[in-house]
């Protein structure tokens, strides 16, 4: 009787397993087996995401990896609507302006370019014909477009796209006391959704995030020390006013933006054709006809 019962139980378990069907294909590069990776690249139509964050101070109340934590939350939710392969954690961006703060990891400009180029080259070698860099860090907004532009220096068999920003949702009058640019209401609201256990609301008032306005130059004149001149505490805004509801609204807008970007990149066939044409012509500029 015992053997019969065990046999029936085993058969039942097997039937349940069969009924579950094939396992869902992960989107994260590091979670795929080698065979699954081949399937994932096919399913993604060769489209891979490279979410980029940074390690830097985020006021007195948010973790150093806030940018990476938030951008990965967004991309991981976006690919449930439009599948793409997500590259593992990447925080090797531009953050020279925060080198004076504990915990900041600031690589040289040369290292940033070399490492990102090597990374996208390896992604391309592994079948990523379209690499969509999803930026989660404001300090990368000049670096990443320049990197994309630099892809015209030499031929590549993949195309780099850069996505940054979204239609941020802010409460009326949110910036009446000054800019809300770093670890303030918006970013803190996002963290209350993505990682509430790492968000220390009781510390948000421990430092000032006010604009110090220590250098006054025309808007069309740039100097590298501008951020430190305005926000020496590496804090811009007031995180104490953050709410989870605001974070949910803002993150959904961000997710929607990334979904649209993935779909647009998948549909784009012209960039590769034109890039290939450009490489061929740039090798023989004297033969370019007009």
Predicted features by range, described:
Residues 20-110, 114-132, 138-290:
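Extended, histidine- and acidic-residue-enriched regions that form the cofactor-binding/catalytic faces
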Residues 1-2:
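N-terminal secretory signal peptides that target proteins for export/translocation
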Residues 5-16:
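Bacterial N-terminal signal peptides
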């Amino acid at each position: 009787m015992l053997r019969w019962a065990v046999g029936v139980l085993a058969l039942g378990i097997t039937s349940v397993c069969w009924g579950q069907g094939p396992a869902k294909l992960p989107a994260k590069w590091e979670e795929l087996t080698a065979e699954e990776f081949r399937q994932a690249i096919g399913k993604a139509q060769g489209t891979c995401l490279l979410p980029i964050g940074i390690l830097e101070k985020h006021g007195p109340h948010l973790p150093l990896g806030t940018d990476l934590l938030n951008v990965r939350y967004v991309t991981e939710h976006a690919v449930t609507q439009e599948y793409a392969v997500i590259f593992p954690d990447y925080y090797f961006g531009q953050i020279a302006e925060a080198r004076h703060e504990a915990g900041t990891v600031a690589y040289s400009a040369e290292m940033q370019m070399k490492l990102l180029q090597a990374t996208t080259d390896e992604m391309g070698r592994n079948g990523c014909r379209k690499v969509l860099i999803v930026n989660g860090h404001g300090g990368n907004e000049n670096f990443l477009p320049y990197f994309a532009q630099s892809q015209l220096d030499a031929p590549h068999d993949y195309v780099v796209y850069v996505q940054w920003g979204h239609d941020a949702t802010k409460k009326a009058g949110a910036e009446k006391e000054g800019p809300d640019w770093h670890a303030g209401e918006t970013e803190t609201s996002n963290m209350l959704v993505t990682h509430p256990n790492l968000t220390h609301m009781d510390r948000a008032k421990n430092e000032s995030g006010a604009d110090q306005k220590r250098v006054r130059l025309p808007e069309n004149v740039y100097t590298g020390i501008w951020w430190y001149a305005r926000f020496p505490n590496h804090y811009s805004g007031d995180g104490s006013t953050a709410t989870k509801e605001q974070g949910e609204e803002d993150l959904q807008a961000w997710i929607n933006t990334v979904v649209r970007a993935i779909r647009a990149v998948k549909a784009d066939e012209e960039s590769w054709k034109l890039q290939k044409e450009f490489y061929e012509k740039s090798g023989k500029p004297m033969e370019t006809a007009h």
